[in-house]
Amino acid sequence: MLRSMWNFLKRHKKKCIFLGTVLGGVYILGKYGQKKIREIQEREAAEYIAQARRQYHFESNQRTCNMTVLSMLPTLREALMQQLNSESLTALLKSRPSNKLEIWEDLKIISFTRSIVAVYSTCMLVVLLRVQLNIIGGYIYLDNATVGKNGTTVLAPPDVQQQYLSSIQHLLGDGLTELVTVIKQAVQRILGSVSLKHSLSLLDLEQKLKEIRILVEQHQSSWNDKDVSRSSLCQYMMPDEETPLAAQAYGLSHRDITTIKLLNETRDMLESPDFSTVLNTCLNRGFSRLLDNMAEFFRPTEQDLQHGNSINSLSSVSLPLAKIIPIVNGQIHSVCSETPSHFVQDLLMMEQVKDFAANVYEAFSTPQQLEK
């Protein structure tokens, strides 16, 4: 039996060697294929876990954004009410002064300015914080993902985070003061000559707000016979590059350098077309909500209905400007409310804001960011 098998192998030596080689190759390829499949499965599982972890961190970061916006609204409201103190004028009117008409004119400008600035600054706060917290959130995610790895440097240590996020104070301080000045000039130009007895409908108010926005956002007109150069709304949210940290040519710590890098990345975002589009969408929604809030005061009376005026017409009811002023003056408490109001909720829940936040977070939470 063994001899016959040996003779068979001798007669078919080449064929047996070939067959053995083929079978051995198939076995090795099978093992190699199994190893590669296992590696692919492990890599896909790791990527899935990393993506799920990043998604969870992103969603948590958005909740932090929302809570931060709400927590800062009282500070914004207080700063506005301090700079545009209409309450003191209202108190003066109750004392029946001799310059009553002059006080009413001041109240007209301050009331409209305050509500318009409230809309602008709240929209800016919502979008700016989305940018800042998603940039820093991306860095924090990368820090957490690389913790424990040899040779890794923390991208955003707590002291850098604090220094970077403190830049929001520009919007609540000098930036807000500049914004108040610009908007007050625009309001004076559009409404300064409008008589207190002149009646305006909701449609008229909408048109006046549009005219004021054009002056504020495009700066294509001149005030007080002086040319006003074009500028973006970015200047109210971030100081110029030459100020505080960036102006120091020497003595910068590693923390300062990292903070400047974060601020420059933020400025790049603020100057991008996407940011401009999102902020403009927020402003459109904000002013629309402002008009909605005032619409309830323009409801037709029974007498109007008897005369056949349409309930849905924006021009069916008109009020003297003197009666509109208190309505406008009180809008700051709705716009800058720390309790989730329709105004703030509308801004926080806008799909454009969510998508923009996701894009910012995606850009700063990828491993490629480590190579920069």
From Swiss-Prot:
One of its GO terms (molecular function) is lipid binding. PANTHER family: PEROXISOMAL BIOGENESIS FACTOR 3. Its main location: membrane. GO terms for biological process: protein import into peroxisome membrane. InterPro entries: Peroxin-3 (IPR006966). Interacts with PEX19. The keyword Calcium does not apply. Pfam families: Peroxin-3. Identified in all tissues analyzed, with the strongest expression in liver and in testis. It comes from the Eukaryota. The chain crosses the membrane at residues 16-36, 117-140. Residues 1-15, 141-372 are cytoplasmic. Residues 37-116 are peroxisomal. Belongs to the peroxin-3 family. It is a multi-pass membrane protein. Residues 120-136 are annotated as: Interaction with PEX19. Involved in peroxisome biosynthesis and integrity. Assembles membrane vesicles before the matrix proteins are translocated. As a docking factor for PEX19, is necessary for the import of peroxisomal membrane proteins in the peroxisomes. This is Peroxisomal biogenesis factor 3. Keywords: Membrane, Peroxisome, Peroxisome biogenesis, Transmembrane, Transmembrane helix. It is found in: Peroxisome membrane. The keyword Zinc does not apply. The gene is Pex3.
